[in-house]
Amino acid sequence: MSILFYVIFLAYLRGIQGNNMDQRSLPEDSLNSLIIKLIQADILKNKLSKQMVDVKENYQSTLPKAEAPREPERGGPAKSAFQPVIAMDTELLRQQRRYNSPRVLLSDSTPLEPPPLYLMEDYVGSPVVANRTSRRKRYAEHKSHRGEYSVCDSESLWVTDKSSAIDIRGHQVTVLGEIKTGNSPVKQYFYETRCKEARPVKNGCRGIDDKHWNSQCKTSQTYVRALTSENNKLVGWRWIRIDTSCVCALSRKIGRT
């Protein structure tokens, strides 16, 4: 249909040019070559379109059923909050690198040191590293001599028995303790930081003016990716809350300005 339209249009155009232009009209050979090029372009376009349709049909016919996209369940978790694990032995390590957090560790042995770039001075470690503990104490004493003190005292440790947590939607989920991958299972460890005590000094946080402020040390949480399950199914990576810092919470005393 498009080829016939090109021929009719060019014949009409040629008739107009023949009436209005004498010496400046297009030569016969150039007009014929233009018609041929347009016809060839139209044929090539139709051929490519047909090939694309054939390729798409062949791909859909060979696509495995397991790879067919499924409609999300109504009321299910958002994609950003939940990433399923299809095969524990093939996808686990790849997704762990993708969602990696220094506070979450998959290992076949209990870690003995804090994650890289984290301070050693508040780390509650294993007796195996007793010499490092004494070194940290000497370092802390050296800081005290310089007059440097923390508003709140915190401690950090690897949690080895975490069984449940609250995810980003506020739902209770089960934290996978042991994951079977290949020959040796691995466990999931969480590096958490919390306050040693709510009031390091008599009136609250250290260094706060207690005449005008009420103060208290509180453990703060943040979200990390972890392998969890919900209702003993839907195993995957979710955002869960863990303890990550100790902060001083202030409130102004009544009647003070």
Curated annotation (Swiss-Prot):
PROSITE patterns: NGF_1, NGF_2. Keywords: Cleavage on pair of basic residues, Disulfide bond, Glycoprotein, Growth factor, Secreted, Signal. Residues 61-81 are annotated as: Disordered. One of its GO terms (molecular function) is growth factor activity. One of its GO terms (biological process) is positive regulation of cell migration. Disulfide bonds join C152-C217, C195-C246, C205-C248. It is found in: Secreted. Residues 67-76 have a biased composition (Basic and acidic residues). Brain and peripheral tissues. One of its GO terms (cellular component) is axon. SUPFAM superfamilies: Cystine-knot cytokines. Glycans are attached at N131. Residues 19-138 form a propeptide. Residues 1-18 form the signal peptide. Seems to promote the survival of visceral and proprioceptive sensory neurons. Belongs to the NGF-beta family. This is Neurotrophin-3. It comes from Homo sapiens. The gene is NTF3.
